[in-house]
């Protein structure tokens, strides 16, 4: 599973090419390189760290090292499939709802674990947000994590080990990721793609993590949605309530456009793997794909909220005359105009409306209703009679 490399870690372990991307987490990089070199991989890992610390990147890198015949060259067909999320032996699970994992998701996972790998010698199961494994789901998973087949590796991730049920933590090797500074996060984005520092800063504000920021910058559709949202924000004070409701509807429609790319990727992956799948497995994949589309739609709305929050924070800087560069420099004119028409308390009220929208989304309130109420509340807050600043 390992490959000799011209790269080495700080403790001189051979470093597979796939692990070179973990340079911002040298301790993690060294731990995984050593485990691969000594053929002592754990059967279950728990990656813990703040969002944006590179847990997802590390999970993909480890999967590449394990499944690639060259030990993680990051260039072969298997590695490319893993990078794109289409490898049939790498299964990524995310919570089916804002409240956590469904017991049915875990039962499907357990049933799949017993099946042989399709392309490689091993299978990897990545369980994101392991802190959202509720007691019934966690209990169903315990024995499988504790005694998985020899060809199976679990990689769980969470913000902290204390947020995960102790029974799960005790069955995993915990790997801690340090929090990246803003400068390191921007540098990671700029290493990954050709982006300016300002583009990286804007993308980070919209998405929260370097990995998602890269995806954002590579998506013309998502960048267009941001531009549309800036226009809505700029016209909010001059538009009437009907215009605001129309804007909310248009934003919801725009948020659905990127889902077409997700559907096409799902269909491509299904076409590549359907010869290996039983009819029952096909149904499981289709159900998982539907859950992914629902989750992606929700994440698109959350991204809109983050963009609005970033714009409002820039307005707040202007209202308070803080000597600090705004994030959304490409919307500086709009930000200055809104700041001249409102005051600090109004902006704080608008920010509270964004937080309330996040709360409502977490409780499965309709996305369109959530946006409508939020935009109306932001308009109301910002148009309060100006106070002395």
Task: Identify the role of each PLM range.
Residues 2-64, 77, 81, 150-152, ...:
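Charged, glycine-rich active-site and insertion segments that engage polyanionic ligands
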Residues 74-101, 163-164:
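AAA+/P-loop NTPase substrate/partner-engagement loops
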Residues 96-103, 130, 174-175:
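Flexible beta-alpha connector loops of hexameric P-loop NTPases
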Residues 129-133, 160-161:
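Conserved Walker B
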């Amino acid at each position: 599973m390992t490959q000799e490399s011209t790269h080495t870690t700080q403790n001189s372990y051979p470093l597979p090419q796939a692990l070179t991307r973990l340079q911002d987490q040298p301790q993690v990089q060294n731990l995984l390189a050593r485990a691969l070199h000594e053929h002592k991989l754990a059967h279950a890992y728990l990656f813990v760290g703040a969002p944006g610390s590179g847990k997802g990147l590390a999970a993909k890198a480890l999967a590449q090292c394990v499944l690639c015949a060259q030990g993680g060259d990051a260039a072969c067909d298997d590695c490319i499939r893993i990078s794109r999320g289409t490898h049939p032996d790498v299964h990524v699970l995310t919570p089916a709802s804002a409240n956590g994992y469904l017991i049915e998701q875990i039962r499907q996972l357990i049933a799949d674990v017993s099946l042989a790998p399709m392309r490689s010698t091993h299978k990897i199961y990545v369980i994101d947000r392991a802190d959202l494994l509720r007691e019934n789901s966690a209990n169903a998973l315990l024995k499988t994590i504790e005694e998985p087949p020899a060809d199976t590796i679990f990689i769980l991730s969470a913000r902290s080990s204390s947020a995960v049920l102790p029974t799960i933590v005790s069955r995993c090797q915990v790997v801690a990721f340090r929090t990246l500074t803003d400068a390191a996060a921007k540098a990671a984005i700029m290493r990954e793609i050709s982006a300016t520092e300002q583009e990286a800063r804007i993308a980070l504000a919209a998405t929260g993590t370097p990995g998602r920021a890269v995806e954002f910058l590579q998506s013309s559709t998502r960048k267009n949605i941001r531009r549309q949202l800036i226009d809505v924000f700029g016209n909010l004070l001059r538009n009437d309530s009907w215009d605001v409701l129309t804007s909310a509807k248009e934003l919801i429609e725009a948020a659905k456009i990127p889902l077409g790319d997700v559907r096409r990727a799902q269909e491509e992956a299904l076409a590549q793997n359907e010869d290996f799948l039983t009819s029952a497995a096909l149904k499981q994949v289709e159900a998982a794909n539907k859950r992914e589309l629902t989750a992606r739609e929700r994440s698109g709305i959350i991204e809109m909220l983050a963009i609005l929050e970033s714009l409002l924070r820039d307005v707040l800087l202007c209202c308070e005359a803080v000597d600090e560069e705004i994030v959304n420099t490409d919307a500086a004119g709009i930000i200055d105009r809104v700041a001249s028409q409102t005051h600090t308390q109004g902006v704080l009220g608008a920010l509270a409306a964004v937080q309330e929208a996040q709360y409502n989304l977490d409780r499965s309130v309709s996305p369109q209703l959530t946006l409508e109420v939020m935009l109306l509340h932001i308009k109301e807050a910002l148009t309060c009679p100006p106070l002395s600043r």
